[in-house]
Amino acid sequence: MCSSDLLHEFFGNIYEEVYSNSIDKTAEYIRTLDEYTPGSFERYNELSQIQGQTKIPRARLMIEELLADNTTMINLLNDCFDAAEAEDQQGIANFIAERLDAHAKHGWMLKSFLKDQRA
């Protein structure tokens, strides 16, 4: 079983990687297309395909839900990659490819945690 300190550090690393490496860049790429990002938390939630948690789940369920959300994110990124390539937006496609690599890594790490918890 993974210690809570190890999981806390792991989740913190994912949080830092996602928020440090994607949020601002995503917004900047959206602006290069003369579009605007959602301007409020409510609008962001309306558009989101990933739902937040209202309770604090046990560690295993937390990992399972994060893995499912990560898979959703990979599917969305694949759709975005295809759209960027179809519109000949190579810079955006490259950025999305980097995000896909990062989420693939998150996925195998989450699966590894789940496998280790079965032992």
Label the predicted regions.
Residues 25, 94-119:
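Short, contiguous alpha-helical
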